[in-house]
Amino acid sequence: MNDIETRDTGTKNDNSSEFNLSVKSHKRKRSFDDENLELEESREETSGGILKKAKTQSFSESLERFRFAHAGSNNEYRKTDVVKNSDTDNGLLKSAVETITLENGLRNRRVNVTKKSTLKASVKKSTLKKKNEVDPALLQGVPDYICENPYAIIVGLNPGITSSLKGHAFASPSNRFWKMLNKSKLLEGNAEFTYLNDKDLPAHGLGITNLCARPSSSGADLRKEEMQDGARILYEKVKRYRPQVGLFISGKGIWEEMYKMLTGKKLPKTFVFGWQPEKFGDANVFVGISSSGRAAGYSDEKKQNLWNLFAEEVNRHREIVKHAV
């Protein structure tokens, strides 16, 4: 009987526990429902009379909200309590839009910089292309400037594109011809010339000409036949003007063609820059190194030393002539 009473008591206790849990659960659900009702009323008030209400939350949603809710201002995050028309969300949306706009702005700035650099490069490329598109066959050569019986005649290979376009000898900024000539003191009275003064060389007892008259972008564009023809024409010029000291040949390649025209042979391997044992049209020959920027195999110092040697001989002859008068 005691066992029966115990079992009955246990059953009553179990039923009592279930009843208590049900009451507690009902009270909690009612509490959440009341809170949801207050929330809906609050939303209606803040929406300024808008009839559209937020979706009623289920018990599980309320329980989820209870887990993540925090006491504090409306700016604090709640997982399920999201109202699209609230000031808080509008602020967050505005902030997000501003962030995206800023990122896009920075990205656009980077793109614009890239486009600007590309534009500069394309402008330089188009300018270079335009220069290269000049047909040398349509260009004119530069004139010779030679006086009767000069002290010396300077001989270049042929006019470059820049020289042809400007109409003056050795006009390219990469060519150091005029700088080396000035530094050698070949001109009288310590004068200093630029390519614009090529016509003034005869006033200093000097002349200037080229092996070939045809302009080209490079000496490699010249044909062997026209260089040999140029050597023969140069030979006649030298005999015609009769330089007193000799010829200054601005580059070994020029002398190779002149030597071949004279002898029918190639220049010997024993060649040395400076005064040559052969004469050309009864004139002495001095071979210097090309002043072109492409002649990078020799130092500027060596090039200048050769200019100085030739200038010394010319100036020595000038003094002799002056004293003779």
From Swiss-Prot:
GO CC, one annotated term: nucleus
Gene3D superfamilies in the cross-refs: Uracil-DNA glycosylase-like domain
Main location: nucleus
Start and end residues of each stretch annotated as Disordered: 1-50
Keyword vocabulary terms for this entry: DNA damage, DNA repair, Hydrolase, Nucleus
Gene Ontology MF annotations: hypoxanthine DNA N-glycosylase activity; oxanine DNA N-glycosylase activity; pyrimidine-specific mismatch base pair DNA N-glycosylase activity; uracil DNA N-glycosylase activity; xanthine DNA N-glycosylase activity
GO terms for biological process, alphabetical: base-excision repair, AP site formation
Top EC class, one word: hydrolase
Entry's EC annotation: 3.2.2.28
UniProt-listed InterPro entries: MUG/TDG, TDG-like_euk, Uracil-DNA_glycosylase-like, Uracil-DNA_glycosylase-like_sf
Catalytic activity from the UniProt record: Specifically hydrolyzes mismatched double-stranded DNA and polynucleotides, releasing free uracil
Subcellular localization: Nucleus
SUPFAM superfamilies hit by this protein: Uracil-DNA glycosylase-like
Comp. bias intervals (Polar residues): 12-23
Biased composition (Acidic residues): 34-43
Compositional bias annotation for Basic and acidic residues: 1-11
N-terminal signal peptide: none
Xref: PANTHER family: G/T AND G/U MISMATCH-SPECIFIC DNA GLYCOSYLASE, G_T MISMATCH-SPECIFIC THYMINE DNA GLYCOSYLASE
Described function: Removes uracil from G/U mispairs in ssDNA. Also corrects G/G mispairs. Does not catalyze the removal of thymine from G/T mispairs.
Family, similarity comment: Belongs to the uracil-DNA glycosylase (UDG) superfamily. TDG/mug family.
Protein name: G/U mismatch-specific uracil DNA glycosylase
Organism: Schizosaccharomyces pombe (strain 972 / ATCC 24843)
